[in-house]
Amino acid sequence: MTALAHAGIAAERTREPGGSEGAEAIRRLLLEGADERWDAVSETLLFYAARREHVIRLIKPALDRGLWVVCDRFADSTIAYQGYGRGLPLEELQALHRFALGDFASDLTLILDVPAAEGLARAAKRSGSADRFERLDRAFHERLRDGFRQIAAADPRRCALIDASGDVDDVQRAVLSMVSARLGVALAP
């Protein structure tokens, strides 16, 4: 966000699930509680309820005001988590997206790629307790990584895979370089 501000680009930072009052309430339902709290379909419907609220209440109004929106996770995460991770049919998830959001999509999706074991180790080092997804087994996280990689390969115009196994500074440089190249702006750390 600092790099965008230094480049004179006004931006709104947000996250999913969450980002608006209703979506944050749904976030708590999704991330807290027992791992088996929701079946895959119920979980997906909750994610899309949160996403629709988020888009209507925050993302579209920000875009209408000429702001860039930087969102930590979006629709590709549902394809990866509930499709590749939970095994729901991808075409049904895509149909749900069209129903909830029409043709609304991100201009650029950066997929920070790290081996599953490394990602789980990093999550374990963060303060606070693990959420429902972080507690899932390594096999789930392997499917998740594979899903994100397949998403990036299927839509290389919109998606960029970034090696996130390096240190924070290296990853930041890679992100800024990719955003600069893809969106035609000069960003520096």
Please identify what each model-predicted range represents:
Residues 44-46, 111, 132, 161:
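Short aromatic/hydrophobic contact patches that present stacked aromatics
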Residues 78-146:
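A glycine- and Lys/Arg-enriched "phosphate-lid" helix/loop adjacent to the NTP-binding pocket
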